[in-house]
Amino acid sequence: MKNIKFGHSLLGTGVSIVLFALISDYIGFGKPGFQAAQLLLLQFGVLLSVTSIGFLASGSELKVSRLINQITTRIFNSPTANWVYFGFLITYILLFIIPVFFNSDRRIDYLTRYIPEITPVGRDLSFATSGIKSWLSGNGFYLKDLNYPPLYAVVFSPFLLLTYPTTFFVMTAITLFSMVVSGLILPSLILKNKDSAVLFFFFLTGIFSYGMQFELERGQYNVFAFTLSFLAIYIFHRHYQFRHLAYLLISVAIQIKLYPIFFTLMLVKNWRDWKSNILRFTGLGIFNVSLLFVLGYKTFIDFINTMLILFGSVWTRPYNHSLASFVRDLTSTGLGVFKPDTVSVLQENSSLIKFILILYYLVCLAIIVGRAYRNNESGINFDLFAVCTIGAMIIPSLSIDYKLPLLSPVMALALSYSPKNDHKIRQIIKMIVLIVISLAYSYTLFSFVHRPVFLANCFPLFMIILTGITCLNVVDKRSFSQVESQEHLTAQ
């Protein structure tokens, strides 16, 4: 079809709509008088008529099939950022616009009281420093039900030189600085300013998120521990001559929070060098076990007893996103979704459900590691980093929502890497997966108070992200050796 023919058709349609809008009142169509519907038709007709001018001015041939192909190609080849933003837009409408502006009260309902606050702020920091003070006084470190490794008392002992609220101010500054390092500086160094839009977007979402506010309110140090781990990973892969510093940093992180042990899997330079990898992990294991004796044998025994109590108990709260907490909630309340009979069946099989969920995580982890081994990859594997972070979130029995900011940097890295793929089916799958991952992540930015009941606990969202990352790794045939090789070329 020639553009000029299509233009005439469009012009005829537009003029017809305008004429109908003008004479509809005279022919008795609709309500008497010039109504809003007629004005709408009038505007639409004028729009079509004006648009037709462009087609009339062009005499080239218009092929619908070619046009559709161009549109679909443009959509499928859209930058990753577009699909990430689209997922965020959906969440923004569902969890902000609708509850704030479209509520039944017909008034602005500000999102307030969405953190289970404790007065005064910085309670966890004050509680932990009081334990350090107790240890220095000779009364023991674990008298106050603390569950941190012994080295924590050494690392954070300088806080005793300060008084509250100065301690809280200093910890807040450390956390914010750590967030800048882990969420902006290190990813920028790794990506060399590529996909900076996605990177900066995730940094902003992380620093303004509900989880970050929770972290600051409690005076927690998850972001600090994660930053030490991330810095260790970066040094190990990009400045290998300083690898011993990397071992020290990640060991300190483990001795502060324990769960950074998941990130030791990132300290692999050559997946097929079994001897070096075994020696490295063995050395790290021996070193970290020895650090548990830093305050003496008795403190070590107290720590072990504390861990046994912690691992044997499940603290069920909507903001405890651990696997154990989720299964307990699922099998006791049904998350407000399942009927009592179904809940009873779930409760009888709670151990099996736990096993299946842990097995599913391990399978996803094995797929990522297996592909890295098969491809003999080197460098920082962004997908593995994301999966390790999710493991650090869900495996510990006590895992509170103030750990959520840890997702921001790893998601930025995982979703910023997008190898070119011309296979249409894979492009469609990738597009859908990116939107789903973005949607799941963006839900974690809002408090459990404003999420749907069945998503109040973040665990299902983590499993969606885990599945999506694994799917991208396989479908997109992602290989991160290319990123590392590009880094070396840039350095030269």
Show where each model-derived region lies.
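Juxtamembrane "helix-exit" motif on the non-cytosolic side of transmembrane helices
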Residues: 23-31, 373, 441-451
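Transmembrane alpha-helices and membrane-interface helical segments
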Residues: 181, 185, 227-238, 266-271, ...
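Hydrophobic core segments of transmembrane alpha-helices in multi-pass, intramembrane catalytic enzymes
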Residues: 43-46, 221-230, 258-261, 403-412, ...
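Transmembrane helices and adjacent periplasmic/lumenal helix-loop junctions
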Residues: 250-267, 396-406
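Juxtamembrane interface helix immediately N-terminal to a transmembrane segment
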Residues: 1-17
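Aromatic-enriched
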Residues: 103, 107, 413-492
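Non-cytosolic membrane-interface motifs at loop->transmembrane helix junctions
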Residues: 31-41, 225, 451-459
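Primarily membrane-embedded glycan-assembly and transfer machineries that use lipid-linked glycans
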Residues: 67-239, 243-245, 270-401, 480-481, ...
